[in-house]
């Protein structure tokens, strides 16, 4: 009887401790900010793609579509982690401005630069401190992808200014798990970030 009571008290104590464990407040805040940022980027890049098409810049439009898909995957991943922490994301409306494709590319470069050099490093520092491993993973996938997007956008802007957009990739592949993005002619056998086989990639 004493053993049963002791075991029961341990279980109750564990449940009580679990219920009263502190929430990773900063990481929750960062996940929400990341969801807003990635969702907005996804919608914005689709709008940029339509603008590029209207200007006859099909290769740049493809790049924007691929990046939009990747950003959407990042938003979904961030949302899953947030919900596993018992928090729901509030509704919001993405806000952005569409200009010329040259201006849109520069805006995209600026956004990706901020995310990879400032936003995600800060998010990762907080996630590591609060020991939220799944947040660390989704933030890392997003940050590493943004580095590649910046490179693609920088190349596209240079080719646009040189009136040589026909030399850009005519297609892209996006990992459905982490959002990693490849030029269609440079796809790995498996995603370099998460190991997903290339036959699962989304072809743009």
Task: Enumerate the language-model features and the residues they cover.
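Non-heme di-metal
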Residues: 19-204
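Positively charged n-region of N-terminal signal peptides that target proteins for export
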Residues: 1-5
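Bacterial N-terminal signal peptides
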Residues: 8-15
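Intrinsically disordered, low-complexity segments enriched in polar/charged small residues
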Residues: 7-8, 117
